[in-house]
Amino acid sequence: MSVMAEVEATVKQLQTESNSLPQLTAELTTALDQWQKASLDITGRVMDDVDLVGACSVNYLMLCGTVLGGWLMAKSALVAMEKTSEDPDFYGAKIITAEFYAAHILPRAGAYATAATADSQLTMGLKEEQF
């Protein structure tokens, strides 16, 4: 199973099991969609644009890291919801941390996706001597 498919499985689990994490569910769903679309866009253009990989790499990696961080936070929150009664302070903190990530970090995925799929000539257009 690909990592993207694993994230998708977690999103489905959130959608079916977790009505108490609506923002995390919504933000991770959106971020996954942005990651998938950016990946398809980049792979669809890379053979015709030799500069694309260099131009998009930083923002694409930031997109990947942001989405994967959200995925791991979601997995942690799902486990924490099951175990809250064992240690309410510890597992409650896990849930709050995941909600924070959803509210403050996951929304950045959209900006990274936009930047990663921008025209490579905007990044690579300067000649070496212009630096």
Give the label of every model feature segment.
Residues M1:
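Gly/Pro-rich active-site capping loops and adjacent beta-alpha segments
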Residues M4-F131:
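C-terminal amphipathic alpha-helical interaction region
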